[in-house]
Each structure stands twice: as C-alpha cells, then as structure tokens.
Swiss-Prot record:
Keyword annotations from UniProtKB, A to Z: Ribonucleoprotein, Ribosomal protein, RNA-binding, rRNA-binding
One GO MF term attached to the UniProt entry: structural constituent of ribosome
Any one GO cellular component localisation term in the record: cytoplasm
Pfam families: Ribosomal_S6
Superkingdom: Bacteria
Keyword hit for Metal-binding: no
Organism, scientific name: Rickettsia felis (strain ATCC VR-1525 / URRWXCal2) (Rickettsia azadi)
Family designation: Belongs to the bacterial ribosomal protein bS6 family.
Protein's name in the database: Small ribosomal subunit protein bS6
Length: 121
C-alpha cells in the first residue's frame, strides 16, 4: 500500500449533507479494498482562482489515504463520473502528516470554524 493525498472541489451549491455522502461513498470504496483514510479535512467554501463552468466558489476537501494504486484509479474514476466534483488532484506522498494542513492553520488564525478534521493513526 502507498500513501496518497487527494484534494477535490465540489460545486458551491452542494449542501454539507451531500458533501458528507460523497466522502462516505469514497470511504466505502477505500474500506472495501482494505485501504484506510489516514486524514481528512474540510477546507470550506473557497473562491476559485478562475470560474469553472458556472462556479465561482467551491467546497474544498482533502483526504490523506493509505491505499493501492488500483483503489486510487477507482476513486479517480468515481470523481470523474460525479457531476458535483468540478476538479480533483491525487498525488503519491511519502507519508501523511498528523499535523493539520497549512490551510487549516491559516483558517484557525482567521477564526474560521473548522467543520471536520479527522486523523487516524
């Protein structure tokens, strides 16, 4: 198994409940294939650098994963098929840090509430 970091952007008009369902679907795929979500972070509704379709903002979500390459391919296939996901990027990592990401640290200094941070060791 290898470590991967995946960030995906969900359309601005999707509710938090629907975002949770999307992440739960990914978690099920990972669990069914003996992988684990090491870390997950909701980065919030953020302004996009440029307009994507009709979206000027998007919900950003980060997953730190311990999975095989086949599971990565399946997750990316599901992300491509999900019309609510407007962009995603998955990269291989040497390890997954137990520290909150720099984006969450910046949000904490701005007094922005953090909705979900989970670290599984």
């Amino acid at each position: 198994m290898s470590f991967y970091e995946s960030v995906f952007i969900i359309r601005q008009d999707v509710s938090l409940n629907d975002i949770d369902k999307i992440v739960d679907d990914f978690a099920k795929i990972i669990k069914d294939n003996n992988g684990t979500i090491v870390k997950k972070e909701y980065w919030g509704l953020r302004t996009l650098a440029y307009k994507i379709g009709n979206n000027k903002k998007g919900h950003y979500y980060f997953l730190g994963l311990d999975i095989t390459g086949n599971v990565k391919e399946e997750l990316e296939r599901k992300m491509k098929l999900n019309e609510n996901i407007i962009r995603f990027l998955t990269i291989k990592a040497d390890s997954i840090s137990s520290e909150p990401s720099q984006i969450l640290k910046n949000q904490s200094t701005e007094n922005t509430p953090v909705i979900d941070v989970t670290i599984n060791n």
